[in-house]
Regions:
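Flexible beta-alpha connector loops of hexameric P-loop NTPases
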Residues: 100-110, 166-169
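Short, well-ordered secondary-structure micro-motifs
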Residues: 39, 83, 105-106, 141-145, ...
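Glycine-/small-residue-rich active-site loops that bind phosphorylated ligands and cofactors
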Residues: 77, 101, 139, 168, ...
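Glycine- and Gly-Pro-enriched alpha-helical subdomains that act as flexible
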Residues: 109-112, 135
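Conserved C-terminal guanine-recognition region of P-loop GTPase G domains, centered on the G4
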Residues: 116-187
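Short, glycine/charged-enriched secondary-structure capping and boundary segments
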Residues: 42-43, 63, 107-110, 145-149, ...
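Conserved G1/Walker A P-loop phosphate-binding module
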Residues: 2-104
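Canonical P-loop GTPase G-domain recognition
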Residues: 23-35, 167-216
Length: 216
């Protein structure tokens, strides 16, 4: 089952409809070390960002139904490039951004990554939405807040995925989501798990809505 959505800003109503296979068509397009090396700005883009151990690659693979679209590493912080995945029906991209905060690299390199990430978020005009992934047990760190500040400055749509929700009881996960939602009323906040597929349908609906070009 998939969902059709009707939305104003980030307030979403969900309705049963036929399974939408669009995200399953996503395919790797290119990688870029900096904004200057990114492909030309054309269709809408949804960026995926989060701490280096937040599960970005696993989430991308789960949302697209592909086991190896994005590389999953046992070493947090291996995503050092800006990776573009084309979604054919939109002419746009899902963009896997370098993780921040935990990577086992020299501080100078870590700072360089953060500068490139900040420049991309601030200046990439076709970036219409941002999916911020946070471990449900440790949400809204200082670095997460900084990423959201970039998005707010651009008046960007934001989806907050509280990953690894299967690690908590249903009640604990619900309380964590409510706490974050109260702090971010302008964002959609979802519990999410690549293990038990919690939040997959709602997250897919949000992404498809903000990639359909209707708000460009």
């Amino acid at each position: 089952m998939a969902l059709e959505i009707y939305a104003v800003k980030d307030s979403i109503t969900l309705r049963d409809t036929q399974l939408d296979p669009r995200l399953a068509q996503a395919k790797f397009f290119t990688s870029a070390p900096t904004l200057a090396h990114c492909p030309p700005e054309c269709g809408p883009e949804i960026g995926f960002c989060g701490r280096s151990n937040a599960g970005k690659s696993s989430a991308l693979n789960t949302l697209t139904g592909q086991k190896s679209l994005a590389r999953v590493s046992k070493t947090p912080g291996r995503t050092q490039l800006i990776n573009f995945f084309e979604v054919p029906h939109t002419g746009g991209f899902l963009v896997d951004l370098p993780g921040y905060g935990f990577a086992k690299v020299p501080d100078a390199i870590k700072k360089q990554w953060q500068q490139h990430l900040g420049k991309f978020l601030a200046e990439r005009r076709t970036l219409t939405g941002l999916v911020l992934l946070m471990d449900v047990r440790h949400p809204m760190t200082t670095l997460d807040e900084q990423m959201l500040s970039f998005a707010d400055h651009r008046d960007m749509h934001t989806l907050l995925l509280l990953t690894k929700s299967d690690k908590l009881s249903r009640n604990q996960a619900a309380k964590a989501r409510l706490t974050v939602q109260k702090r971010r009323p302008q964002s959609l906040v979802l519990n999410f798990s690549s293990f038990d597929k919690t939040g997959i349908i709602e997250a897919s609906a949000w992404i498809n809505h903000h990639m359909d070009g209707s708000e460009q």
